[in-house]
């Protein structure tokens, strides 16, 4: 927490900003309860919000306190200057050093899901930078160059290694999770100068 930004830990299960079906209990609701001065660039539903994490993902969110900080953070995210590192527990053996370069977009059949089969797919790049293996699962450190909705979950499922207990992209691997959040992210964010 400083004059420009506040960094908060978003728990798994919490939605970042209000949307249809999620008006209360969001990260924005909690922020506004504690901090009244946030950047107005995101409007009333997304004040100070520069990036987001999926509902099921826990991790750090950086929030802009004023418009200048918001603009600088948005520029850094747009220019891919922010290092976004995630940790994911997945089924199977995944080799470190793997690059997944598969465009993704809204699934043409199941509209609530994201897929590699979308006609309006956008560039999405995921890299597995570290992997540890134990009894049929891999604990991965993953970096994303892009930040598409469900990107890591879709990419890992597309290569046959879904995130453990993922109800949407886990396929036959929908076992109960060993921990409430098998996907955690990001562990490092670059704050504005």
What is each residue range found by the language model?
Residues 1-193:
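RNA pseudouridine synthases
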């Amino acid at each position: 927490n400083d004059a420009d930004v506040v960094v908060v830990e978003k728990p798994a299960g919490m939605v970042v900003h209000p949307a249809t079906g999620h008006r209360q209990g969001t990260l924005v609701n909690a922020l506004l309860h504690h901090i009244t001065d946030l950047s107005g660039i995101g409007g009333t539903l997304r004040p100070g919000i520069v990036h987001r994490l999926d509902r099921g993902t826990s991790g750090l969110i950086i929030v802009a306190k004023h418009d200048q900080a918001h603009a600088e953070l948005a520029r850094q995210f747009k220019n891919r200057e922010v290092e976004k590192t995630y940790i994911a527990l997945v089924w199977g053996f995944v080799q470190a050093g793997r690059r997944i370069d598969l465009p993704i977009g809204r699934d043409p059949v199941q509209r609530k899901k994201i897929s590699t089969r979308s006609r309006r797919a956008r560039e999405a790049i995921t890299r597995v930078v570290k992997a540890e293996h134990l009894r049929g699962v891999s604990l991965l450190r993953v970096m994303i160059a892009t930040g598409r909705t469900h990107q890591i979950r879709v990419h890992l499922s597309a290569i046959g290694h879904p995130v453990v207990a993922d109800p949407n992209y886990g396929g036959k691997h929908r076992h109960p999770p060993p921990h409430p959040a098998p996907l955690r992210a990001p562990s490092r964010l670059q704050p504005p100068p």
